[in-house]
Regions:
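Conserved thiamine diphosphate
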Residues: 1-131, 146, 192, 235
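Thiamine diphosphate
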Residues: 36, 100-237
Length: 237
């Protein structure tokens, strides 16, 4: 990266960021600021969960979120990935790209639904975007008006003014879904969006516990059923 190359650094399981992140955030991300020497690295953090224990699983993009000099994106479709890579090639920044194995089989692009007045708006990150779509469809069958915003750019956060207005005009605000612990990106973005829209923003993500190797002790991102129940409880309470 220091010799005008653009390396791609692959972290096979995002949980391994606890070991890999220090050299990225403490050198590559600071090189441009300290020495005016860009160190553009494309970091592929690949998420997965389910029977892989307390170290490897889930998405851990929050580890990079508070550190300066890093941009974070979470593409879940082919065109989104191309967009992120093209941006990286135009800039001289460190990119942390939060991927997920669960998205690799999807070829259909994901679109926001922000037209009209909604009861509540789902703001979905990473692999939760697919379960969010299922929950949205189920809730609409029950008569609820549910919007959805698919978050590609996490840092800096990029949500259009039109999408923000959809949250502002909704009855009950929004809910952020993430494949990470909520005491990180989810709560941070909830606070930020709440200030902009003057609406309550709820969060859902991983439970505050370590995952085991058996399905009974796993720690998985919110399912469509759990999302649906949470949204109904928000609307009715």
């Amino acid at each position: 990266a220091l010799s005008n190359e653009r390396p791609i650094y692959v972290i096979r399981y995002q949980g391994f960021n606890w070991y890999n992140a220090p050299m990225i955030v403490n050198y590559a991300a600071k090189s441009k600021e300290f020495w005016n020497t860009p160190c553009p690295v494309f970091v592929r953090g690949i998420g997965m969960e389910g029977g892989i224990g307390p170290v490897a699983g889930s998405s851990h993009h929050s580890l990079y979120f508070r550190m300066p000099g890093v941009k974070i994106a979470s593409p879940m479709t082919p065109l989104e990935y191309k967009k992120v890579y093209k941006n990286f090639m135009r800039e001289k920044e460190v990119y942390y790209v939060s991927e997920h194995r669960g998205s690799f089989g999807y070829k259909i692009e994901l679109k926001n639904d922000i037209k009209g007045n909604k009861d509540l708006v789902i703001i979905a990150i990473s692999i939760t975007r697919f379960e969010a779509i299922k929950a949205k469809k189920n809730l609409e069958k029950k008569g609820f008006k549910i919007g959805i915003i698919h978050v590609l750019w996490i840092k800096p956060l990029k949500i259009s003014k039109t999408a923000m207005n959809c949250i502002t005009n909704s009855k009950y605000g929004g809910i952020i879904l993430d494949d990470d612990y909520v005491d990180g990106i989810a709560n941070n973005l909830a606070n930020k969006i709440s200030h902009i829209t003057n609406k309550r923003i709820f969060t859902m993500g991983l439970k505050n516990k370590s995952a085991g190797f058996h399905k009974k002790v796993d720690n998985l991102p919110p399912t469509s059923d759990k999302i649906e129940k949470k949204i109904i409880s928000i609307i009715k309470n």
